[in-house]
Amino acid sequence: MKQVDIKLLDPRLQDVFPGYATPGSAGLDLRACIDERMEIHPGETLLIPSGIAIHLADPGFAAMVLPRSGLGHKHGIVLGNLVGLIDSDYQGQILVSCWNRGQAGFTLDPMERIAQLVIVPVVQAGFNVVENFQPSQRGEQGFGSTGKC
């Protein structure tokens, strides 16, 4: 298991330390470390503090902030940047950009679970500038070229 340094910036997280819900969970929940209930109006995007900072330190890893499926499907609450990417050398608080793409306001309570954090491997590639690529079966065929969407 990869060990990650974490700072708990909000003392309330001592009671609900970020962790994995099940042995098969890929992501751990991020919570809304806000002091009082707030409304996210339709079309509005707000930055919500998570109360944690992490330092991955290893350039072979990054963290991704992803939406919670239930919030998006049931309430229209998704990430304003769709996916948040946390680089291995970032050490600041993780902020969650919450966008209400729904038709109704959404009430966010303090310490509510709002997103998930997934640690992923990263490959930093070197690039060779070429004039042409070796032919492949797909070539330059793009959107929808491999079958019905």
Curated annotation (Swiss-Prot):
The keyword Transmembrane does not apply. Its cofactor is Mg(2+). Gene3D superfamilies: 2.70.40.10. Keywords: Hydrolase, Magnesium, Metal-binding, Nucleotide metabolism. Its EC number is 3.6.1.23. The keyword Protease does not apply. InterPro entries: dUTPase, dUTPase-like, dUTPase-like_sf, dUTPase_trimeric. This is Deoxyuridine 5'-triphosphate nucleotidohydrolase. Disulfide bonds: none annotated. GO terms for biological process: dUMP biosynthetic process; dUTP catabolic process. It catalyses: dUTP + H2O = dUMP + diphosphate + H(+). Pathway: Pyrimidine metabolism; dUMP biosynthesis; dUMP from dCTP (dUTP route): step 2/2. This enzyme is involved in nucleotide metabolism: it produces dUMP, the immediate precursor of thymidine nucleotides and it decreases the intracellular concentration of dUTP so that uracil cannot be incorporated into DNA.
